[in-house]
Amino acid sequence: MQFNPTLDSIKTYEAGKPIELVVREYGIKPQNVIKLASNENPFGASPKVIEAIAKEAVNAHRYPDDSMFELKEGLAGRFGVKSENVIIGSGSDQILEMAVHAKCNASSKVLMSKTTFAMYDVYSRQVGARILRTPSDQHHLGEFWEIYQKERPEILFLCLPNNPLGECLDREEVYDFLQKIDDETLVIVDGAYQEYAAFKDSQKRIDPKDLIERFPSSIFLGTFSKAFGLGGMRVGYGIAQPSIIQALMKMRAPFNITTLSLKAAIEALKESAYVEETIKENFKEMRRYEEFALAQGIDFIPSYTNFITLLLKNRVDSSEFSQWLLERGLIVRNLKSYGINAIRITIGRSLENDRCFELMQEYLHQF
């Protein structure tokens, strides 16, 4: 059977390995598997959110409010915008998909960092767009500008902070750069980890209202999957000028999040204090990873997220290292598929991190 030939250039995205796979393949009990691969909040959603989900389960047979009025109002209030500035998706990556399909076609170009969120590439290839990448792994706006001037792409992707590396540009540096961008270029600012960046350094904070007022051709993406602890609920959002939102709404399928997901996100917005406590604990534990790396003579990228990337260089092979850890019940993310000999580790709970240090040290001491 023949399919769209543009699919030939697309690699199937591989998410972080699930706990269930480790149980099946290695016979390890679920309670002995530690998953530090998918950048989930290890503390989960707040107890009040869990309670709200449980109560809402009796309505699982009902479609959700497709207007998502209450959630849009909550997000509008949080960011000081109007509900017509908000669109909801099944994760922020669904809004990425909407944006690329709404803006691009086979004659379009998109620009992104060499090493960044893989779905930018996937969605762009789906429409046949030409993909432009900077030469450096991390975001360097001088490189973006050099390519932008020559190519004038239809979409510019900025991942702030950047996944899978963890670095983050200062807000003013970003704004100075965006002043030079044409109105016809859609600037997608992916803020999936913005709650972490803003907590660690206020100079990294991107205010969605400020962004879209200064740069009307931009869209800010956020998610409930990371800091809010709702990865399994799959809820993300976009904030942009109404004209952009209206275009994206034409790409949205009806009822694109579930009744339970909608309720969870609405309640999660009320739990800012809980979320902040988990973020504080995240950076407390991250310091332990930085100290471990320094003690082992391993480079790392200073992170503004809930994960840390260890650059292994010639010390050990990241594929062999991550596989060895996997066989012992520790799931981390191997970055070899990005062309980097590195592993990305989600910051877990204290006891999970203890076990991670123990296993990594055991492996590294062999070399």
Curated annotation (Swiss-Prot):
Molecular functions (GO terms): histidinol-phosphate transaminase activity; pyridoxal phosphate binding
Keywords: Amino-acid biosynthesis, Aminotransferase, Histidine biosynthesis, Pyridoxal phosphate, Transferase
Gene behind this protein: hisC
Cited InterPro entries: Aminotrans_II_pyridoxalP_BS, Aminotransferase_I/II_large, HisP_aminotrans, HistidinolP_aminotransfase, PyrdxlP-dep_Trfase, PyrdxlP-dep_Trfase_major, PyrdxlP-dep_Trfase_small
Matches recorded under PROSITE patterns: AA_TRANSFER_CLASS_2
GO biological process, one term: L-histidine biosynthetic process
EC number(s) per entry: 2.6.1.9
Protein name: Histidinol-phosphate aminotransferase
PTM annotation (N6-(pyridoxal phosphate)lysine): residues: K226
Enzyme type, top EC level: transferase
Catalytic reaction annotation: L-histidinol phosphate + 2-oxoglutarate = 3-(imidazol-4-yl)-2-oxopropyl phosphate + L-glutamate
Subunit structure: Homodimer.
Tagged with keyword Amino-acid biosynthesis: yes
Bridged cysteine pairs (disulfide): none
Listed pathway(s): Amino-acid biosynthesis; L-histidine biosynthesis; L-histidine from 5-phospho-alpha-D-ribose 1-diphosphate: step 7/9
